[in-house]
Amino acid sequence: ERNEIVLNEKNISGCIKMYLDEENLLDRFFILPTIPEMTNIKDFERAIKQINVDYEIQLVRKKDLLKVQSEANRNTPLAISSMVKIIVAACIYKEISEGNIELSSTIKIKAEDISVLSAGIGKQNIGDLFTIEELLKLLLFVSDNTAMDIFIDYLGEDKIEKFLNFEKSKVENKGYKFNFPLTKNIYTEAWCTESNSEQQWRNSAMKKVVWTEGLDYFIDLDYVRYSMNYLLNNSWIPWDDIQNNNVIYKGGSAPGVLSCIWSTRNLEKEDFLQFLFVINKRAPFSLLEELYIFGCANKLLDFYGVLKVR
């Protein structure tokens, strides 16, 4: 048996479909936002405008680049959260190309390396050896903050800035300074200053908006796109080791921040496509809003034949 609850949240709507078992108990349920038609980047922008947000959206299709952005952030970059890890990964690949390190090079985990809110490496790994290849997988697949800090500490802000300046000739200069603090520093200040349990930290990190206080990574999407292209030019990237890797995805999220990139693999192909966006809101996104945004993105990608929405 199926029951349905209608959802209405300001300018977006949807429903909860609940399926009951033979004993009339809840078996499963789905939250389904109402998704408008998606045939181009303007449709996606129009849909995003239904939520009170700042945004930047980019689409590369048939070697043409389309950009749209909200008026409020014309001259300032938005917070991109963990999507910054694509840039850090590209910097590591540049180090590899210059012969300074190898994918097989190892790093021993020290106590001071361990970040907060980490998704992979923890205190149990102190003293363990990780290869650069393993750290790249942790960085890009599970968005591991400790892997990020190890790479930032190895590179130093100078090498990251040098890499970004290398790309700056292709990017409009908005006159801001690159800033890449350790995740341990920025996220401790954001959510972990009180001596509470990690469970309380993680709860705070799901609810408390801090990008408005400058506690995030702020950078133009152009740098993310160029960094992804730099990754694609390498003979091996972490996505090579997983199935169904014809489309690469990396996202980032924090309260009030959503950022994503989808990219096909071959830069030289006529049908090469990249779709990326960053959306900033001064309050946490509701679950319906997040599902709505991703539903709109998936529908647009499905229209272009990149993803199949079931």
Enumerate the language-model features and the residues they cover:
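Active-site SXXK
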Residues: 79-107, 139, 275
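Second-shell loop/turn segments in exported
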Residues: 34, 71-80, 120-126, 134-138, ...
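Active-site-adjacent helix/loop patches that line small-molecule binding or acyl-intermediate pockets
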Residues: 126-204, 219-222, 230
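C-terminal and inter-domain tail/linker signature
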Residues: 1-45
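Short, conserved catalytic-motif segment at the N-terminal edge
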Residues: 51-78, 93, 100-101, 264
